[in-house]
Amino acid sequence: MKKTFIRILSIILCLTLVSGGAAFSSAASLPATNTDAVATPDAPEAVVTDATPFRISVAVNGDTTSSKGIIWYTKANTASVVNIYDENGAKVNVPVDYADVFEFEGNYVHKATVTGLAAGKTYSYEVGNGTEFSAKGSFVTDNGDAKSEFLVIADIQASNLKNFQSAARVVETGFNTMPGAEFMITLGDFTNDSTNEEWDLYDEAMKNINLKTTIAPVAGNHDGLGVWDWFNNMFNLDTSESVQNLNGVNYSFDYGNAHIAVVNTNDLLSISFAQLTWLKNDMNSTDKDWKIVCMHKSPYTLGKDGKWPDALYLKRSLTAVVDMCDVDLVMSGHDHQYLRTQPMKYGMVNEDGATYVLAGTAGTKRYGVRNFLEGYMMNTKHIAALTTQNNGHYWDGETHENENELYKGGIFNTIAIDGGKLSFNSYVVSDRAEDEEGNIIDMNEAPTVTLHDTFTLEKEVGQNEITFTGDNTTSEAEYYLGAIPSFFGLAAYTLGEWLPRVFAMLPALLVDVVFMDGSF
């Protein structure tokens, strides 16, 4: 409710600014398989003190062949110490840059950036104060070749332990399905309200997973809008090119022969001109074969947020940069359903365009299709695949009324890149499972994993060229000077394109919501 209020208030402000500005201007002039759950043996209960590390994670930070960003929290203001060990358990001496410990929301935040690691190696690590340390975690470094494997999830967005554990089961099954996954992209909305209580529950459910991987996090609206600084204080990221860090972080990194940019769609409610410029320069500064963009809000959706202008504005603003820079894949979350477009360029199906994937939700909050959006906010001819996890419906090329009971569950996605081939698989971890006779039974310890969408992108490698070599940072002055035209850009879209579509859509909306018992 709070997020909807913020969105409506921002839209009203947009309309007021534009109308006021206009007055001023006038006056002046597939198959299902059973995957065994990962068994984690019970460890002896550790003694918890104010120096005990919690909320531990490793994030991409800088050169993925040699660097990692580690973060953890403590209840007391203690020293920061990180120990790194090689595959044989021997301690290795590598540079560690410790940030000053600072207090945030009643706890103390520790950030340490590790550099000087060897490429293509597995390391273990522990964090602490020099006398008390965490359990050991592990990570791998990129070996720099043209092969990589990683997981993609979105929208855990829970507020109680049971739902966090349900999402953790989905993610754990993902790593069990792709045991060679080197890192995990999370497309935003880690919790529902970004409170200490919820982040502690997230940590309780996810800590054993987060200890064994590297995260590339994306800021969701529940991580940034109205909950300032939480996102940047939950991960240790390279913020050197981020246009602002208050409600999210934009950054990029190379992994193998892919260049991946993370965009903050909380920035001025949707996206600022400064960030669009950053993305264009960033994508033009790489000669990697694969260009991938990750963000939270989705320009292509049939979910409940597909009726608002902040996400739809991305279809006008961000997609223009995607088209200009020959991006291959755009991944997003936000609308808690799975949707893949045909390859799109200049708003039309084009085999040379980018594929947009709304990556579903790993969590339990799932949205169905808003039928009134069809033809007004989303052209169904652009859909290649669609799965709604709340009711198991899926797209058959013409309609989404087909149902598969096994599609009711949490989604994880896998990406495998091998030179000029990118393979994308999307799986549903069913809330329910089949018995030996094929009957649907209650969820058990061996989750049913169903491949519900798969596609492959292929291209000739070595074709991308670097066309930008300048400074891609944004000063505070540049950002705030550009904020007003950025806001007017969203407002102009709201008045000139979104509002007429809403008026045209109203009859369909009323029929669907009032007479067909649909959801708004």
Please annotate each region the language model reported.
Residues 4-25:
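Sec-dependent N-terminal signal peptides of Gram-positive bacterial secreted proteins and lipoproteins
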Residues 115-119, 220, 357, 415-418:
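Conserved beta strand-loop-helix elements of the APE1-like EEP
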Residues 180, 212, 287-288, 332:
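Active-site acidic short loop of glycosyltransferases
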Residues 30-81, 87, 91, 106-109, ...:
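Metal-dependent phosphoesterase/phosphodiesterase active-site architecture
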Residues 184, 215, 289-295:
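Generic beta-sheet signal
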Residues 42-218, 224-249, 277-281, 309-324, ...:
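Divalent metal-dependent phosphoesterase catalytic cores across multiple superfamilies
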Residues 21, 188, 219, 295-297:
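A cross-domain feature marking catalytic cores of carbohydrate-active enzymes
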Residues 156, 221, 266, 297:
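Residue-level signal for short, function-critical loop segments
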